[in-house]
Amino acid sequence: MSDLTKQMIYDIYVRLLHLNEQKANTSLQQFFKEAAEEDVAEIPKNMTSIHVIDCIGQHEPINNAGIARKMNLSKANVTKISTKLIKEEFINSYQLTDNKKEVYFKLTRKGRRIFDLHEKLHKKKELAFYQFLDSFSQEEQKAVLKFLEQLTSTLEAEQTDGTPDKPVK
């Protein structure tokens, strides 16, 4: 691969990162719009809270450590978010009868509406993504998959130890 091609790939990668940041800012606004159309009155004020609701909805019963692990968040951050979600009545906390130390979370009816709306939006985006992938051949899809797997491994390694590594092969 030529240096020019590598530079073009890198430039597009950086552009993709910037677009992803911008998209994150518009996702909440889109969620608010969809919620209004579905007559969902109360909504958490940030996407992380919505994603915590989604995580709880997908994995009930789940505790603080489970949410932190699945979402790659600190336990302290999950505690802060879950406390707010309990106060806003999107989730409830409870203890299992055989384990009084662990606190688990489940969705309230209000939280379930947020979860269902979030799932609906994700399904719509997933379908659009699959349709986009259909424009590539099987071989091209395999190359994209390999690239994304290796890039993800590299980024996860950097996040774990804080040092940029060479891409994992």
UniProtKB/Swiss-Prot annotation:
PROSITE patterns: HTH_MARR_1 (PS01117), HTH_MARR_2 (PS50995). Keywords: Activator, DNA-binding, Repressor, Transcription, Transcription regulation. GO terms for biological process: negative regulation of DNA-templated transcription; positive regulation of DNA-templated transcription. It holds the Pfam family MarR. Residues 64-87 bind DNA. The keyword Transport does not apply. The keyword Transcription applies. SMART domains: HTH_MARR (SM00347). GO terms for molecular function: DNA binding; DNA-binding transcription factor activity. It comes from the Bacteria. Residues 10-153 form the HTH marR-type domain. Disruption phenotype: Deletion of the gene induces changes of proteins involved in cellular processes depending on iron availability. In iron-rich medium, mutants overproduce a red pigment after entry into the stationary growth phase. Induction: Up-regulated in response to iron starvation. Negatively autoregulated. Also repressed by CcpA in stationary growth phase. Represses the expression of the yvmC-cypX operon, which is involved in pulcherriminic acid biosynthesis. Also negatively regulates yvmA, yvnB and its own expression. Positively regulates yisI expression. Acts by binding specifically to a 14-bp palindromic motif, the YvmB box, which is present in the promoter region of the target genes. Homodimer. This is HTH-type transcriptional regulator PchR. It comes from Bacillus subtilis (strain 168).
